[in-house]
Amino acid sequence: LKWLCQYMGDFMEQNGIDHYRQDFNIDPLEFWHQADEANRRGITEVKYIEGLYAYWDYLLQRFPNMIIDNCASGGRRLDYETSLRSAPLWRTDYQYSEPMGYQCHTYGLNFFLPQHGTGAYYVDRFDFRSSMSSAVVFNWKFTQTGQSFLDMQKCIEEYKEVRPYYYEDYYPLSGIGNLT
């Protein structure tokens, strides 16, 4: 861990990097289980998570103005401790142009985690608005039928207009039920 911290910190300093994004796009559970001793199930995962927190703490101490973008690995790294250190600008790998799923993520996360984002794939109002949150990745294809550059510009302007409201109080239009 000490070597990694020093190496990455020096690399970032030498190259003027002030925004760090972490993603690993694998399911590590099987690797963790294989590394565990029979009577110590879960210890490798615990050590990994403790190491992750220590690594990010080192980066934030060395670079106090650094932004850590926690690509949440399919939502698996959205926990209290990572939220203290980072923002998930890509909150989940569930992003395959399915607007109802986007709305469910936004609805639930906005109660606890105001900074998060996902991708916008289409410029029609329903799909695009379903993707909006405090951050959004425009994943448009200029060559896709039914999408024009003008429509893309309109979406971006609409997003710029409403984005400040994502940092205000959150009152969903549907019931919240019991959050405990």
Model-predicted segments: where are they?
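Active-site-proximal loop/short-helix segments
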Residues: 17-46, 74-84
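Glycan-recognition surfaces
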Residues: 1-2, 6, 46-144
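An active-site-proximal structural segment forming one wall of the substrate-binding cleft
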Residues: 1-24, 59
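Short, polar/charged, Gly/Pro-enriched helix-capping and turn/loop motifs at alpha-helix termini
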Residues: 18, 66, 166-169
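Charged, low-complexity, helix-prone segments enriched in Lys/Glu/Asp/Gln
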Residues: 44-51, 82-86, 152-166
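Glycan-recognition and catalytic regions of carbohydrate-active enzymes
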Residues: 117, 139-180
